Amino acid sequence: MVQTKKFRGVRQRHWGSWVAEIRHPLLKRRIWLGTFETAEEAARAYDEAAVLMSGRNAKTNFPLNNNNTGETSEGKTDISASSTMSSSTSSSSLSSILSAKLRKCCKSPSPSLTCLRLDTASSHIGVWQKRAGSKSDSSWVMTVELGPASSSQETTSKASQDAILAPTTEVEIGGSREEVLDEEEKVALQMIEELLNTN
């Protein structure tokens, strides 16, 4: 009942079994990884899920290169070699189960961080998106080219700014997410317009 080791993403139930769960960084939700006999098994499940979600730079309980050799984070080796052999043979099945759980949790379009960003190098302002996962990438969803600042542009009305912004936007629209992006596009243009009006 007394917990001797503390692993990330692992806790012990009152009746002695160990459970693992991981928090998705972008969805702000907990993903249930399962119930395990030992804390080490639960910690390894957490490690695999963390690597699947965040790539090789994920915070794990065990070193990534020694993940299946039986070494713990303190450098001590496990007593039972048979448990490490069974964990290495079942790691591929565990990995597929964890991938399925992560896909089930993320049924919505791929999780991402979206923000308004100013690119001073190329004089653009726009909506920038960073995707989560091991194959994470970042890209501009929509950009608006900023022209040279002049006193006549500062006094333009809101209607003329709409006319300026409309033809210069570049939008990447993916298949079935058109309606969602249309709403996001409206919000992004409104945010860009408000930023341009405040300057």
Swiss-Prot record:
GO terms for cellular component: nucleus. It comes from the Eukaryota. SMART domains: AP2. CDD domains: AP2 (cd00018). InterPro entries: AP2/ERF_dom (IPR001471), AP2/ERF_dom_sf (IPR036955), AP2/ERF_ERF_subfamily (IPR050913), DNA-bd_dom_sf (IPR016177). Expressed in aerial organs, mostly in flowers, and in roots. Also observed at the branch points of pedicels of most young flowers, and in a patchy pattern in roots of mature plants and very young leaves in the rosette, including support cells of their trichomes. One of its GO terms (biological process) is wax metabolic process. It is found in: Nucleus. Belongs to the AP2/ERF transcription factor family. ERF subfamily. Promotes cuticle formation by inducing the expression of enzymes involved in wax biosynthesis. Confers drought resistance. Acts as a transcriptional activator. Binds to the GCC-box pathogenesis-related promoter element. May be involved in the regulation of gene expression by stress factors and by components of stress signal transduction pathways. This is Ethylene-responsive transcription factor WIN1.
